[in-house]
């Protein structure tokens, strides 16, 4: 009979996604992103200057931080203070890499964009939701710079989105919830541009290997999700 999704979705169906722009007052871009029961607050701040290794080159930079609120999961987690977990460091590097691929830093000038992705509620897919929502916040921050006359042209060169795909009973399923994530034998996070160029693949098997054919199926399903996510980004940004 195969895997039956707890929420009744089809195998290629995303969870409902929404972007609430202007969520906080002071960030240049601020978006509360909801993907099913997962909620991530994505803020982008603009700072003058760049890291030392870029000084004098006329180029900009983007960096990202990722955290989870203690009550974002059913069991309260301790706040990460001075020492970040390996998972947190991995995720914030992923967010930064993914969003840097969206930008032409020569057009940004010597300023740094700081992305803060804070998970308010987690039901799997927090890193993919953070990337997809932070792109919308990034677009709003760039628009603010353009409106203020600080930039002459937009440095955004690619739309970027991310989605999870998992194998459950040997079949690929898009955008896993937590209940599905823990049951999946293979779990992938896929980051792509609007033209479906791959920016990152993170895939692991839990106890079972998977074939090249199944990998191709996973990527096919991911492309379906990326197209829909970027369409949602464009819709909310009025593109």
Swiss-Prot record:
Keyword RNA-binding applies: yes
PROSITE patterns reported in the protein's UniProt record: RIBONUCLEASE_PH
CDD domains in UniProt: RNase_PH_bact
UniProtKB keywords: Nucleotidyltransferase, RNA-binding, rRNA processing, Transferase, tRNA processing, tRNA-binding
GO molecular function: 3'-5'-RNA exonuclease activity; tRNA binding; tRNA nucleotidyltransferase activity
Cross-referenced SUPFAM superfamilies: Ribonuclease PH domain 2-like, Ribosomal protein S5 domain 2-like
GO BP terms in the entry: rRNA catabolic process; rRNA processing; tRNA processing
EC number in record: 2.7.7.56
Sections of the chain in a coiled coil: none
InterPro entries per record: ExoRNase_PH_dom1 (IPR001247), ExoRNase_PH_dom2 (IPR015847), ExoRNase_PH_dom2_sf (IPR036345), PNPase/RNase_PH_dom_sf (IPR027408), Ribosomal_Su5_D2-typ_SF (IPR020568), RNase_PH (IPR050080), RNase_PH_bac-type (IPR002381), RNase_PH_CS (IPR018336)
Highest taxon listed in the record's lineage: Bacteria
Binding residues annotated for phosphate, in chain numbering: 87, 125-127
Enzyme class: transferase
Record field: catalytic activity: tRNA(n+1) + phosphate = tRNA(n) + a ribonucleoside 5'-diphosphate
PANTHER family according to UniProt: EXOSOME COMPLEX COMPONENT, EXOSOME COMPLEX COMPONENT RRP41
Assigned protein family: Belongs to the RNase PH family.
Purpose of the protein: Phosphorolytic 3'-5' exoribonuclease that plays an important role in tRNA 3'-end maturation. Removes nucleotide residues following the 3'-CCA terminus of tRNAs; can also add nucleotides to the ends of RNA molecules by using nucleoside diphosphates as substrates, but this may not be physiologically important. Probably plays a role in initiation of 16S rRNA degradation (leading to ribosome degradation) during starvation.
Quaternary organization: Homohexameric ring arranged as a trimer of dimers.
NCBIfam families: RNasePH (TIGR01966)
Name this protein carries in UniProt: Ribonuclease PH
């Amino acid at each position: 009979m195969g895997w039956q999704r707890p929420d009744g979705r089809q195998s290629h169906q995303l969870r409902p996604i929404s972007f609430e722009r202007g969520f906080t007052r002071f960030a240049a871009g601020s978006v509360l992103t909801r993907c099913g029961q997962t909620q991530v607050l994505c803020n982008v701040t603009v700072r003058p200057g760049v890291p030392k290794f870029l000084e004098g080159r006329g180029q900009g930079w983007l960096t990202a931080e990722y955290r989870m609120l203690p009550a974002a999961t059913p069991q309260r987690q301790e706040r990460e203070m001075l020492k970040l977990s390996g998972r947190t460091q991995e995720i914030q590097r992923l967010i930064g890499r993914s969003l840097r691929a969206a930008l032409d830093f020569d057009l940004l000038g010597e300023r740094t964009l700081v992305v803060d992705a804070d998970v308010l509620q987690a039901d799997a897919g927090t890193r993919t939701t953070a990337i997809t929502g932070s792109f919308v916040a990034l677009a709003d921050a760039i628009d603010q710079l353009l409106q203020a006359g600080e930039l002459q042209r937009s440095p955004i060169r690619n739309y970027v989105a991310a989605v999870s795909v998992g194998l459950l009973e040997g079949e690929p399923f898009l955008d896993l919830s937590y209940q599905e994530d823990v049951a999946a034998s293979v779990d992938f996070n896929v980051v792509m541009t609007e033209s479906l160029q791959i920016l990152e693949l993170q895939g692991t098997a839990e106890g079972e290997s998977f074939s090249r054919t199944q990998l191709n199926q996973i990527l096919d399903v991911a492309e379906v999700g990326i197209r829909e996510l970027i369409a949602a980004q464009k819709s909310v940004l009025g593109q």
